[in-house]
């Protein structure tokens, strides 16, 4: 009985498919995750700006929807090439987004640049706009990590835990942490709960920077923890061996520090017109 209980779970036996065959083309779940995540974020942002104190109008939300989508795609890809695959620089392969390879940290930079542009053009308080966008990012984070799991990619390090899995794309075919699910839980569900609670049930949105600061600390902290379970990219194994931390962890440390600085600034800065009670949902 003990031997049977310790047998790893075979991903291939879960009946998962990386896409939906529509006949004329296959809709991959990773693409679907991006689409659904963006639509959910857009819908919820529309609900948020109808509540008292919103820093933007619907027209600004429409602009953010467009430019942040571009920021995620281009920032994520450029960040991946710069941080993880500099060997692709100067080649056509650096533009092949459909072959996979997106950087979380690059996507964050792309979104921040998009927010700065829209805020500058619309004369908006960019820090408050960041707050509103940050609340909605976990929708996409959760769906994206679940898509990674459905694709059987970005699996974790070898382990003997009872829920360990063997993924078909693993050349070593050893039991590993399903780290995609850990990330979906921490970066997605947990951060979703924290950000929605802070926005709808507290006065955090009336203090510019609190929400985006908490989000930055939480998402980077979750990534830092998850990296202990996630298998490092083969071409970056030397970073882990030489420093004890992965590339993702080194990139997360400055994000945590920036998030802390933003929260401290937001809480110590005097605000005007803060209401007695937060608006209800």
Swiss-Prot record:
The chain crosses the membrane at residues 29-49, 64-84, 100-120, 124-144, 180-200, 209-229, 248-268. Pathway: Protein modification; lipoprotein biosynthesis (diacylglyceryl transfer). A 1,2-diacyl-sn-glycero-3-phospho-(1'-sn-glycerol) binds at residue 145. It comes from the Bacteria. It is a multi-pass membrane protein. One of its GO terms (molecular function) is phosphatidylglycerol-prolipoprotein diacylglyceryl transferase activity. It is an enzyme of class 2 (transferase). Its EC number is 2.5.1.145. One of its GO terms (biological process) is lipoprotein biosynthetic process. It is found in: Cell inner membrane. GO terms for cellular component: plasma membrane. InterPro entries: Lgt. HAMAP family: Lgt. Catalyzes the transfer of the diacylglyceryl group from phosphatidylglycerol to the sulfhydryl group of the N-terminal cysteine of a prolipoprotein, the first step in the formation of mature lipoproteins. This is Phosphatidylglycerol--prolipoprotein diacylglyceryl transferase. It comes from Erythrobacter litoralis (strain HTCC2594). The lineage of its organism: Bacteria, Pseudomonadati, Pseudomonadota, Alphaproteobacteria, Sphingomonadales. The gene is lgt.
């Amino acid at each position: 009985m003990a031997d049977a209980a310790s047998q790893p779970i075979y991903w291939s036996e879960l009946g998962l498919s990386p896409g939906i065959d529509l006949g004329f083309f296959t809709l991959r779940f990773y693409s679907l995750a991006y689409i659904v995540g963006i639509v959910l974020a857009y819908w919820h942002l529309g609900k948020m700006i109808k509540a008292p104190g919103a820093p933007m109008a619907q027209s600004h939300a429409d602009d953010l929807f467009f430019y942040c989508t571009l920021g995620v795609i281009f920032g994520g890809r450029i960040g991946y090439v710069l941080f993880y695959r500099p060997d692709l620089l100067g080649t056509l392969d650096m533009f092949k987004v459909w072959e996979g390879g997106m950087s979380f940290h690059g996507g964050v930079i792309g979104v921040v640049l998009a927010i700065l542009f829209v805020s500058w053009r619309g004369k908006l308080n960019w820090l408050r706009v960041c707050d509103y966008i940050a609340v909605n990012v976990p929708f996409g984070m959760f769906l994206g990590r679940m898509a990674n799991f459905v694709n059987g990619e970005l699996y974790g390090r070898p382990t003997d835990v009872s829920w360990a899995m063997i993924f078909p794309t693993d050349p070593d075919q050893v039991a590993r942490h399903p780290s995609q699910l850990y990330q979906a839980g921490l970066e997605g569900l947990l951060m979703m709960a924290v950000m929605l609670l802070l926005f709808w049930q507290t006065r955090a949105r009336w203090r510019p920077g609190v929400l985006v600061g908490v989000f930055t600390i939480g998402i980077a902290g979750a990534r830092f923890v998850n990296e202990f379970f996630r298998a490092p990219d083969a071409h970056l194994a030397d970073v882990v061996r030489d420093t004890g931390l992965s590339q993702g962890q080194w990139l997360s440390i400055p994000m945590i520090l920036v998030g802390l600085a933003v929260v401290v600034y937001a809480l110590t800065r005097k605000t005007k017109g803060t209401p007695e009670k937060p608006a209800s949902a």
